[in-house]
Amino acid sequence: MAWKCPECGNWNTFEEVAVETKKTSYLADDFTNSVHPQNLTDVESVKLSRLSTGNEEFDRVLGGSGGIMGIVPGSVTLLSGDPGVGKSTLLLQIALALCQNGKKILYVSGEESESQVKLRAERLFSGTKGHNNLFIFSTTNIDKAVEEAKGYDLVIADSIQTMVSANFPGFPGSIPQIRYATSRLVNLAKKKKVPVFLVGHVTKEGIVAGPMILSHMVDTVLFLEGEKVTGVRILRSFKNRFGDTSEVGIFLMDENGLCPIQNASEFFSAKSDQKLPGGVYYSCYGRDAPASG
């Protein structure tokens, strides 16, 4: 078949050129080192260590045993909750607390600029000690974020729905983008043995936005919920590969951030009017956390 070029007007001047398409896998790297199957008796036993955040309520929800609770190295934790409930505030507090202990933290923000994150950090912690261990990277490019996340003791991605890569079509928050971004961070955590926290949005129904595979890919799923009237916040665990899911953490939101409430029964009893005629106290048991009311 003869073809005429619309530019020069000549016939049969077209040349067929094969264009190589770049194929990118959702699983960017294989973080495993296994070459062949091993017998269970030959597998080396590794004692599970944990990194304490200094926040007893938060550490207890993450789990542990023998008095050692906190973050498992190489674990990936998804923290979700309603908008404005305090997800970013809680993780920034954890990051600042770890910085005080000499840990190097990377906070990747896809929703705020570096200066906005600094304003929140100064409100939560007025001191200067340890601030040089906290690094802020404002970007929505997941590939850049992973490339920069080297040599840190903890990585926070806020939020996973804002992360995007040029390797995949779709807008931020779409299924291919969320799946790819999560797989990059999971590989980072497993290969470098660095814990990663992801902030996740929720839908109007109160479930994590995005594909259900997001919850399956991570090790721990935490949900932070709050009351509309009071500043009480409750942290629950709905999935935990390294601990129990029955624990809850109770916090109070004030101008200094989220303050742990260690004695929930005493706190809620003190808030009630003890002189109210006909007032009745009762005990309840929810998700293995006893309290009185």
Regions found by a protein language model. Name each.
Residues R120-A121, D219, G226-K239, S246-G249, ...:
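Conserved AAA+ ATPase core "coupling" helix
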Residues K103-I105, N133, P195:
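Residues at the starts of beta-strands that form the adenosine-phosphate
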Residues V72, T77-L78, T89-L90, F137-V232:
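P-loop NTPase motor core
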Residues S75, V248-G249, E255-G293:
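Conserved P-loop NTPase/AAA+ ATPase motor core
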Residues M1-T24:
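Cys/His-rich short segments
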Residues Y26-G127, D143-E147:
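The Walker A/P-loop phosphate-binding site
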Residues S126-F135:
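A short helix-to-beta-strand connector/capping loop
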